Design a protein with these regions (language model features):
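ABC-type nucleotide-binding domain
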Residues: 63, 346-623
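A short amphipathic helical element positioned immediately N-terminal to and/or at the very start
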Residues: 9-24, 130
Length: 623
């Protein structure tokens, strides 16, 4: 392992230990139990010599043997082993509870951090790869903490205890065992080091496979429609082959470790018997049959934990690879928010001044704290303006050029243009999912960079073509737009969105449970719920991103009525593939290659006979 890799591993271990600090008293209990287990194991091995020399050998050839002493000795030996068994049981159960507690905290922290990541992260990472952090990577950590760590501690304590016992029994044999063990440890280090690199690659490959499978499951209809089954299989085979190669290399070394260690242990056992027998026959060091038997048992107790350590090293290396991926995710830079302007609930006092209130007034204002400490309230109206805005997802490649537009309170602004023209990008900038490269965007006259992102997004509503529904009831999905909404407000939002009729036809009405992203509902019904969710939030600004481009004409009419009701009195930005949905807009912006090439209302643009006219008359298709 190179220096950089060792440093990363050290940091990863420190971070794992930081999560374990909370359970230090349980760890003390675990250590005590491990000590008891190890001492009981060694004491049992040592007692075998006493049993043979003091209780069994004297009975050999005796004409009137008395077994009372032997039976008592066997009972004592049984009690010693019972203590060891109970201690092992207790520390294993305790470590399982510690492991689950640590993993819960890691998952909580990981999810909390993930919620703070910018949209860019999710745009550049597959969902399956992100999911593998919560499944494969955390599972390897669970195995390490619940099994590998206690086993390693137990093995280490057992090795120390056995070494002390062996030196007490016979110094010569003890030295031989230590020399032999050094050779075994050298072999273990070499093999574990070789497999470690590939375990890291294996975890990365698992993430890629999960990501590809997730994409294929979500896009299965598209795959079948375009008959890309074979092409998809070929792509999967390539990714799967990469996983196979990395897993093979990792486990090739890992799987030969145990057989090698086991055979070396057997060889050591035979050599101890030969050397011990030779020393006993020559009367060296007072070796007896009982001492040799004890030593043979101690050698097993010595090689077994070494084998266990070598076995657990594979799990630990894999777990550290998974933990490194998790901590890399948690080290990703979170979405920056330096805004100081907040959105507050307000009302008019007796002097018609705007004042902040805890009451639910449905009246909002931007709260700005001035340099002199005074507070300025700006009534939330939904006026959005772009001034000479440039933007690029990559700083070196600008995709929006010199965008200037004005949307006054209650105006409907529509964006039309081919795919990739920049329509959705503009709405992403209003939400501050991405920050602009140059220019200014204002909301009610305030630079949106000064507004806290949470408050900015709270004032915006969005209805997407691809509606995301969550597992839960219809009512809960609508209330997702405003968690403080009452049942009556939910019902009112559904009626406004024209969703009330179909909801009441469901088996349990508003309490009908949907799952699997609402797969049992039609596309139109899903969009009606999305409109209702936006309605219950009651935002002054609405973004309708291609909201009716994938449903039939009849359903579109129902959805359109819901959207028309939702748009009343609000500033609205519309992106649609059907020009019929934008012709009644106050302003229509025609985009091409990231630039606004035409602007005006429907009649004005038709009279200009430019790009919009060509799109509207069918000379060009609107993509």
């Amino acid at each position: 392992m190179n220096k950089h890799g060792a440093q990363n591993t050290g940091k990863t271990i420190k971070r794992i230990l930081s999560y374990m600090k909370k359970y230090k008293f349980r760890f003390i209990f675990v250590l005590i139990c491990i000590l008891l287990s190890a001492v009981a194991n060694v004491a049992g091995s040592m007692f075998i010599g006493t049993l043979i020399d003091d209780y069994i050998t004297p009975l050999l050839g005796s004409t009137n043997p008395v077994f009372t002493g032997l039976l008592k000795a066997i009972c004592v030996m049984g009690i010693v082993y019972l203590v060891g068994i109970l201690a092992t049981l207790f520390y294993n159960r305790t470590m399982v509870s510690i492991a689950q507690g640590v993993l819960k905290k890691i998952r909580d922290d990981m999810f909390t951090h993930m919620q703070k990541l910018p949209i860019k992260h999710f745009d550049t990472h597959t969902h399956g790869d992100i999911m593998s952090y919560y499944t494969n990577d955390t599972d390897t950590l669970r195995q390490m903490m619940a099994q590998s760590i206690p086993q390693m501690f137990s093995s280490a304590v057992t090795i120390i205890s056995v070494v002390v016992a062996m030196f007490i029994s016979n110094v010569y044999l003890a030295i031989f065992v230590l020399v032999f063990a050094t050779c075994m440890m050298f072999v273990t280090k070499k093999i574990a080091g070789a497999s470690g690199r590939f375990f890291v690659k294996q975890q990365q490959s698992i993430g890629k496979v999960n990501g590809y499978i997730e994409e294929m499951i979500n896009g299965q209809k598209v795959v079948k429609v375009f008959c890309h089954e074979e092409h998809s299989k070929e792509d999967f085979d390539k990714i799967n082959e990469e996983l196979c190669e990395n897993a093979t290399e990792a486990n090739k070394y890992a799987n030969i470790l145990m057989p090698i260690m086991a055979n070396l242990g057997n060889l050591q056992y035979v050599l101890i018997a030969i050397i011990g027998g030779a020393l006993a026959l020559n009367g060296v060091a007072g070796l007896t049959l009982g001492v040799i038997a004890s030593f043979l048992q101690l050698s097993k107790s010595f090689t077994m934990p070494i084998n266990q350590i070598s076995q657990q090293l594979n799990s630990i290396v894999m777990a550290l690879a998974g933990a490194e991926r998790i901590f890399n995710l948690m080290d990703e830079e979170v979405e920056q928010d330096n805004g100081d302007v907040t959105l507050v609930n307000v009302k008019y006092d007796r002097n018609d001044n705007i004042v902040e209130t805890e009451e639910k007034t449905y009246m909002w204002a931007w709260k700005e704290v001035q340099k002199d400490g005074s507070v300025k309230y700006t009534r939330l109206t939904g006026e959005v303006k772009f001034f000479d805005v440039d933007f690029g997802y990559n700083p070196e490649k600008i995709v929006l050029h010199d965008i200037t537009l004005y949307a006054d309170h209650g105006e409907k602004v529509a964006f039309v243009g081919a795919t990739g023209a920049g329509k959705t990008t503009i709405t992403n900038l209003i939400n501050r999912f991405y920050d602009i490269a140059d220019g200014t965007i204002t909301y009610d006259g305030i630079n949106i960079n000064r507004i806290k992102k949470k408050d900015l997004r709270r004032s915006l509503g969005i209805v997407l073509q691809d509606t995301n529904l969550f597992t839960g009831t219809i009512k809960e999905n609508i209330r997702y737009g405003n968690l403080d909404a009452t049942d009556e407000e939910v019902y009112a939002a559904a009626r406004l969105a024209n969703a009330d009729e179909f909801i009441n036809m469901l088996p349990d009405g508003y309490d009908t449970v949907i799952s699997g992203d609402g797969g049992s509902l039609s596309q139109g019904q899903r969009q009606l719920l999305s409109i209702a969710r936006a309605a219950v939030a009651d935002p002054p600004v609405m973004i309708l991103d291609e909201a009716t481009s994938s449903i039939d004409t009849r359903t579109e009419a129902i959805v359109q009525r819901g959207m028309d009701a939702l748009m009343t009195g609000r500033t609205v930005f519309v992106i649609a593939h059907r020009l019929s949905t934008v012709r009644n807009s106050d302003v229509i912006m025609v985009l091409e290659l990231g630039r606004i090439i035409e602007r005006g209302n429907h009649e004005q643009l038709i009279s200009q006979k430019g790009k919009y006219y060509q799109l509207y008359t069918g000379a060009f298709e609107l993509e």
